Regions:
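C-terminal alpha-helical cap of glycosyltransferases
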Residues: 442-462
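Conserved catalytic-core segment of nucleotide-activated headgroup transferases in glycan assembly
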Residues: 112-127, 245-330, 404-406, 445
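Active-site and donor-binding regions of nucleotide-sugar-utilizing enzymes
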Residues: 10-12, 25-27, 31-34, 39-46, ...
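A nucleotide-sugar donor-handling region in carbohydrate enzymes
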Residues: 82-89, 187, 203, 207-289, ...
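A donor-sugar binding/catalytic signature common to diverse glycosyltransferases
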Residues: 171-194, 343-388
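Catalytic binding pocket for nucleotide-activated donors in carbohydrate/polymer assembly enzymes
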Residues: 208, 235-236, 329-335, 360-438
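Donor nucleotide-activated moiety binding/catalytic core segment of transferases
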Residues: 153-168, 317, 322-365, 370
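Basic, ligand-binding patches in group-transfer machinery
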Residues: 1-102
Length: 462
């Protein structure tokens, strides 16, 4: 139930996606404001659909809500009633309205520098009338920086944090991990800013979250989530195409004359999960035997990579995924490779790099936003989407990507030299992908996000 828009969500499961619903309030037929059909499949076969209908309950409605499917009245509610009392619905959900209009924003508990930080800064500078706080652990390297800037900081997990999050009207975060979600109750609206562009199918993970609204950056991403017959439960009521808050800063800080390449692969569940519950020595040995470690360690120590970078005067920066940081000492990093400073802004790292080497990570979209080339090193593409924590989505790296896809070191170095010779300028076929991918590149993403958040609590206007 959305008490602000006075809309109620009606859901049911069916094997027939062509059902005709008739929803009646006080014996009058009303029509859904939003509809979504979610498919559930098993072994490549659809076994049922979920229909999700958001229906407006007008202020004049006083009696009962009934639902008919194919002209047959169905039971609704927890106890199998054939109708629900409108007054009771309103009464129950009015109790859940928040106690204040304070907004709590955060990125990770131990790290800022993501969409929530950038949105907070925009609100602080442009809408001081809105009461906001930013949650972070005090030991975070970002705490002092944000404190000096004037952020109203509260320590994540503290008594003050728990007091404020209970009364907050909105919790706004770039992450939706359990350490934060366990604090979310029906009283708050949880706003998901996302950490990166959703390019793969993470519906199983996202569908388990209580998300009132989330923001996306590309049209393909938007369509892959809201369209009927996807695995996502979210539709046009919950998903808004605005661009990411941090992208405004990317545009402002773009550098193009720094000869630096960044190597930034994602992690592998197969290299990490299989070492849980092991002692530290066994854990390290198993990681070092993984294909993931051997391939990336080999590339970092490749003598031809060293020669190319010396010949064309490029520096190399290695930025491991946070899940790989415990194993960083296992990499035999040569003297010419720098480890990215963990205290340095990730946004500035993108801005100060000319080229990225990654595998499947959505960080490639950040470079694409800056119109900088990417090389995808996918030595395990035949098994990655089977053994990792997600399913392949709409994004085709060969067709939709922002640079060449390679499967071995030699091919990677050939593509790298080609880009070095071209002064790291993007080749035309990838340039068109970069130009067509993002819905907005106007520096107004924060403005659109804030306007959407304000609209959330405005009374029904449809």
């Amino acid at each position: 139930y959305d008490p602000y828009k006075e809309q109620i969500l009606i859901t049911y499961y069916t094997r027939d996606d062509k059902n005709i619903e008739s929803i009646r309030i006080d014996n009058e037929v009303i029509y859904a404001d939003y509809e979504k059909i979610v498919k559930y499949d098993f072994l490549d076969r659809v076994f049922c659909y979920q229909k999700r209908l958001w229906v407006h309950v007008s202020k004049d409605a006083k009696d009962k809500l009934e639902v008919f499917i194919n002209n047959k009245q169905i039971m609704i509610g927890k106890y199998g009633e054939y109708f629900l009392d409108i007054k009771n619905i309103r009464k129950e959900f009015q109790k859940r309205l928040p106690k204040s209009n304070i907004w709590l924003l955060m990125d990770r508990d131990y790290e800022a520098d993501d969409n929530a930080e950038h949105l907070y800064r925009y609100i602080m500078q442009n809408h001081p009338e809105q009461e906001i706080v930013f949650a972070l652990r005090k030991e975070s390297s970002d705490w002092e920086r944000l404190e000096k800037e004037g952020f109203n900081l509260i320590e994540f997990g503290s008594f003050e944090f728990e007091r404020i999050i209970k009364k907050a009207s909105k919790v706004i975060s770039s992450h939706s991990d359990e350490y934060l979600m366990r604090y979310i109750t029906p009283r708050q609206q949880f706003i998901f800013l996302q950490h990166g562009v959703t390019q793969n199918d993470v519906s199983k993970w996202l569908n388990s979250k209580k998300i009132n609204l989330f923001f996306v950056a590309t049209q393909m991403e938007f369509d892959s989530i809201i369209k009927n017959y996807t695995r996502y439960k979210f539709g046009q009521k919950e998903v808004i195409l605005t661009g990411f808050a941090r992208h405004d800063a990317l545009l402002r800080n773009k550098q193009s004359d720094i000869k630096q390449i960044i190597i930034m692969p994602t992690w592998r569940a197969s290299a990490i999960n299989n070492v849980f519950n092991s002692n530290e020595r066994n854990m390290k040995e198993k990681f070092k035997r993984s294909e993931y470690f051997q391939k990336w360690n080999s590339l970092l120590n490749n003598n031809n990579l060293k020669k190319l970078c010396e010949q064309y005067s490029y520096t190399v920066v290695f930025k491991p995924h946070p899940n790989i940081m415990p194993y960083l000492k296992d990499f035999n990093l040569p003297f010419y490779t720098k480890i990215a400073n963990q205290d340095e802004s990730l946004q500035m790292l993108f801005c100060n790099s000319s080229l990225m080497i990654t595998d499947y990570s959505s960080v490639a979209f950040e470079m694409a936003y800056l119109k900088k080339p990417v090389i995808y090193y996918q030595f395990d593409k035949d098994v990655f989407f089977i053994s990792h924590t997600l399913q392949k989505g709409y994004f085709d790296y060969q067709k939709d990507g922002f640079g060449p896809v390679v499967q071995d070191e030699d091919s990677l170095l050939i593509k790298l030299e080609s880009l070095f010779r071209n002064n790291c300028k993007v080749f035309n076929n990838y340039k068109s992908n970069m130009e067509s991918t993002f819905a907005f590149k106007d520096g107004k993403c924060c403005q659109r996000i804030y306007a959407t958040l304000i609209q959330l609590n405005i009374k029904y206007l449809m």
